[in-house]
């Protein structure tokens, strides 16, 4: 086995040869080798990167070496090789514990698989080309890592706006980035320009930590002096990081708000229940009084009722509401709310008052009772009285038809048309759903008024005896009239369709000649009198005899039947000699024997009888005998 020193000497032999060639170069010759090496190479963490080192021009032979420059400036060889023509020989690699190890490709370029933050160094490429000389160039590797999304820890406590110094708002952290990212703070979407120097208005502090992986984590804490408008502000932080080729990225953290302590400055006091603009509520309703101050935390509220300039405390609570159940008219007055906030100056006015007006409307009173009887053509007045607050408006209706706005109803020379239901209604235009009504019924006394429904005859101009007719009478009055007829069969008196006090009765009968003389009368009566109407029928035509018409119809029907039978028989015997032919004087055809029957029997009948008696003697399709 060959000793190690011998093998090392064999490897050094070509290098010594190259060195000898370089030393043997003619004096005065100019050696020049130029390299193409990118001064800065950028890569994302975890990606593979290749560092190029290419001599410019044509060189049949050169020696290539790659060095790593540490933080102290010392060089450490990573790889070496010789290039003869296009063939790379005698490669040597020293990974210095890197995993995965460095690689050298076929063109002498240094390959770093899965770039890490620790690979951020200067890499020196040295080329020795014999007589052409020696050259070296440095490539700086920059490794970028996208940081994790920011995590925010807001201050969960209650922050006072009355403090005159900046308070801690929140802390924002971003981990594992490279190079170190930047953290910015925002309020309502607008960036906060806060310095790093401590002051009373606002500043921020930052801290950077290098993790074991070589990545950087950044933490920023925001301090601000708070004001009352910040109670509705939205805060968040964002991380700005760098990418290759001058690009930038941004990651936003979740937004948050703060819980602030600030004194009450304004108080609102209003009616929460349905009410008018003037503060009117209906008697019997439940009324809610609402009070709200703009301080935080929620202050204490005191509700009171002013009576003779003295406060009658009704309730003290944190809810800011007071409910008055089923308010009455004597609860009208001035109500107030006061905010008990001990953080405000003593001279601050933190109370409000409002006027509560309870609207009421008592039952209506009429000068007439529920029913008013008045003789026909008499006159009277009815007065409607209402008591309420605010003053109600009165108007009258008759059977739901409006009559006008006036507390007094005047009835002049009443007729039966005046009878009906009169209603007085009181309402308040400014207060919805507050109204009352009171009604009375007017009864007009008098002899009944009668109206008949005339009928017209069926035949134009006159009635015919036996025609059926229905007669109808209508009547109205008070007391209620009764309808009777001069003939039996009238229907009972019933209210007529359409109302208005009318009643009706009907009678159905047949017209006779006796009715044409006397007619039919209808009478309406009540204790005050009666009225009647007579239905006249005029001339009544006698009825046509129905028996003669029936006999004539039967005779015509029989004659038509015999004619049809004769025609049918002749058509069946058409073409036979002597058939269906008679002499001029009605004698039988020649050659036929004379019948010994009575002379009243006709030949056609004889022929039919003979044919029928012949039984099975059939010829042709007729089915009758051969005799005519």
Curated annotation (Swiss-Prot):
This is Basal cell adhesion molecule. It comes from the Eukaryota. PANTHER family: BASAL CELL ADHESION MOLECULE (PTHR11973:SF17), CELL SURFACE GLYCOPROTEIN MUC18-RELATED (PTHR11973). Transmembrane glycoprotein that functions as both a receptor and an adhesion molecule playing a crucial role in cell adhesion, motility, migration and invasion. Extracellular domain enables binding to extracellular matrix proteins, such as laminin, integrin and other ligands while its intracellular domain interacts with cytoskeletal proteins like hemoglobin, facilitating cell signal transduction. Serves as a receptor for laminin alpha-5/LAMA5 to promote cell adhesion. It is a single-pass type I membrane protein. Homodimer. Interacts with ITGA4:ITGB1. Interacts with spectrins SPTA1 and SPTB1. Residues 569-628 are cytoplasmic. Residues 613-628 have a biased composition (Gly residues). Residues 580-628 are annotated as: Disordered. The gene is BCAM. Disulfide bonds join 53-125, 172-237, 291-337, 384-424, 473-522. InterPro entries: CD80_C2-set (IPR013162), Ig-like_dom (IPR007110), Ig-like_dom_sf (IPR036179), Ig-like_fold (IPR013783), Ig_sub (IPR003599), Ig_sub2 (IPR003598), Surface_Rcpt/Adhesion_Mol (IPR051116). Epinephrine-stimulated phosphorylation of Ser-621 by PKA enhances adhesion to laminin. Ser-621 can also be phosphorylated by AKT1. Residues 1-31 form the signal peptide. Residues 32-142, 150-253 form the Ig-like V-type domain. GO terms for cellular component: plasma membrane. Pfam families: C2-set_2 (PF08205), Ig_3 (PF13927). SMART domains: IG (SM00409), IGc2 (SM00408). The chain crosses the membrane at residues 548-568. Keywords: Cell adhesion, Cell membrane, Disulfide bond, Glycoprotein, Immunoglobulin domain, Membrane, Phosphoprotein, Receptor, Repeat, Signal, Transmembrane, Transmembrane helix. Glycans are attached at residues 321, 330, 378. Residues 32-547 are extracellular. Coiled coil: none annotated. The modification Phosphoserine is found at residues 596, 598, 600, 621. One of its GO terms (molecular function) is laminin receptor activity. The lineage of its organism: Eukaryota, Metazoa, Chordata, Craniata, Vertebrata. One of its GO terms (biological process) is angiogenesis. The keyword Flavoprotein does not apply.
